[in-house]
Amino acid sequence: MELKNGRPGDLSGRFSREIKVYDLLDDLGIEYMTVDHRGAPAETMEACKAVDEVLGTVMCKNLFLCNRQQTVFYLLLMPADKPFKTKELSAQINSARLSFAGPEQMEQYLDIRPGAVSLMGLMNDTENHVNLLVDEDLLSEEWLGCHPCVNTSSLKLRTKDAFGPFLGAVHHTMTPVHLVGEP
């Protein structure tokens, strides 16, 4: 795996959802780096660890959640080494107990499949069905690693660009949360 500036040189055989991410970042003038791992999709946290070492970023856990009634959806970004406690997060956002949303909603709202959940999917949520929650520990990092809506490539971009110009362009806001991962 090799880290390269900007979009991959060869876009043949790539999904349109991936190319759409590069197009938006380029249009916004956001600098980013990519690494391809097409032969080894980052489907597990173990696989992501190897990619994040190449990216030089903190490994991020991206969880697609919903309330019990499946009427409110959340994308939670948090450090991978923190345990996720639904009760802790539910209390902070004043929501009924949260659970993992299904792949159908993930594809419907973010145009992403399981294993590729990413902040970049918010560009496809044009009606703002998904609320972005970000653990404050990630906000203090200089760099953020994420998928370009597929798990066969990864991006490295400045955290300030991800939560500034990118979020503004896709008409989303972020709610910082403080997670400690304790019962």
Placement of each model-derived feature along the sequence:
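Extended, low-hydrophobicity, polar/charged segments
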Residues: 1-183
